Amino acid sequence: MIQNPILPGFCPDPSIIRVGEDYYIANSSFEWWPGVKIYHSKDLKHYEQLPSPLNRMSQLNMVGEGDSCGVWAPDISWDGEYFWLIYTDVKTRTGGLFNTHNYLVKSKDIRGGWSEPVYLNSSGFDPSVFHDTDGKMYIVNMINNFKGILVQQYDPEKECLVGEAKNVFPGTGRGYTEGPHIYHIGEYYYLLMAEGGTGYEHMVTMARSRSIWGPYEEDPGNPVLTSDVDNPEKLQKCGHADLVCTQNGEWYMVHLCARPPKGSRQCVLGRETAIQKMVWNKEGWLRLVCGGRFGQWETEEPAGIPECLFPEEEGKDYGKEDFDLEIADSAGNNETAKNADIAEILSKTKEYLNEKNAVDEECDKKLSMPVKKTSALLDVRYTSLRQPYDSYTSLTERPGYLRLYGQESLNSCYNVSLVARRQQDRYVQVETCVEFAPTCREQMAGLAYMYDTGNFYLLVKTREEEFGSQTLDLKKPAKLRLIKSDHFDVEDVIPAISIPEEGPVYLRVTTTQEGLYAKIFYSLDGKDYQELAEVPTNILTDEQSDGFTGAHFGMYCHDMTGVRRYADFDYFEIVKTRKEQ
């Protein structure tokens, strides 16, 4: 059996394709950089994360975009030669005014080499590409204000939309019609949609027509998939789906879901990706193979497809990252950056850095802060806010450490120095060790547990000053602060603690009570940890933050003086402390 969710923790809005014996899923990334998460599987059960396709600011510039803006609901497709990726870059979403720009990129290799984007339209979000059996391409998207589903032909040679755009279906009447996908199966064009809103009333509905332009008849059994809201121990928020047919002719639906803790509707893990096996009934409509319409915790594995693990992926979701950059000598022997010559490291990685961490120079010129390209190379699971982290990080200036140069504070939508990982389980322990020498209270560095710019916890080293002081007093002790921001209302959870001016400080967060709370610790030697507080995590959820992402843990540094004072992080560790039920 396949256990759900297949992609845990902040992996919403899945789109799936099969190319031969390989399956690929694309997920929304919102304001998190790089844009769009891609996962690869051979058995629909085990997955490896691939490099993100939108890794240049010429493809995606989110600087200044608000919380839960950025990349919404990408769609991935394949025409036999090219992979196509269509996505929305949402600039604003406040006051019911959605500025939604849709773009298309392509590549012959899903692991890299994605083109510059082609602008399509701004008529709505959740776009998808439909490749018909006659070779024609169509762009499908919902219409802003949920007025229906728009279809228009696309000319791949001219790289533009052609012909008339038509509203082919107004929705089923359940509201919030979005997430459209079209499939040509047999004599029908099937239209798959998300409706009900992306919360607890979320659902998947279908309609069909003998022409792509309609008219479409609604599935009498709608919704095809939804959630048992009266049974909170079941998968919740099931909706926004896509379909794939295996090489053996079996059908599966991937969809987003959520896992609220018992007795709560607060989903700190955000919206995740699940999968259900499907079957076509005699009337030609799609149904869950298990019957009913509620998303299940597990589903049947595809027949005739062997289980395929990715040994190189084992342990990457959890474990300790020491930031030791490995290089190989002429004999093929590896040594870490702590023992290697920096010039040699820079020489051997220069070509790779130029390719993998390219940042559009024109976009750099538009940033308000000076850019220091130091180009850290990290696992694809690490992410940053709105722009590449290579402008403020280094793995080579102090070998064996990740150096972060401080920029703006975490409530900024512009230049924030944060390198983070999404929370994937309710019970985790996250730990890091930082060395930092602040000169004023406007300089902070440490561990962030965050949802967005207005909702977060910070455990940071800083310096204490008298309010309104005109002089710098370095005799004032360094301080450790635990800061809470609840809808931009910022306060200290506990009084600041004096800590040594020099030397490392170890920071730890351990989630408890099914992720509803988190215990905060610190240590000066990495052995004797002192508990500072136990804090609620409700501010880190979709329900409290009015967002669409999920909780992240990250290494963080800010310097609001503009000097870009740096902090050095020795390691970053995530450990699962209890097996999920």
List the model feature ranges, each with a label.
Residues M1-Q581:
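Carbohydrate-active catalytic/glycan-binding domains of CAZyme proteins
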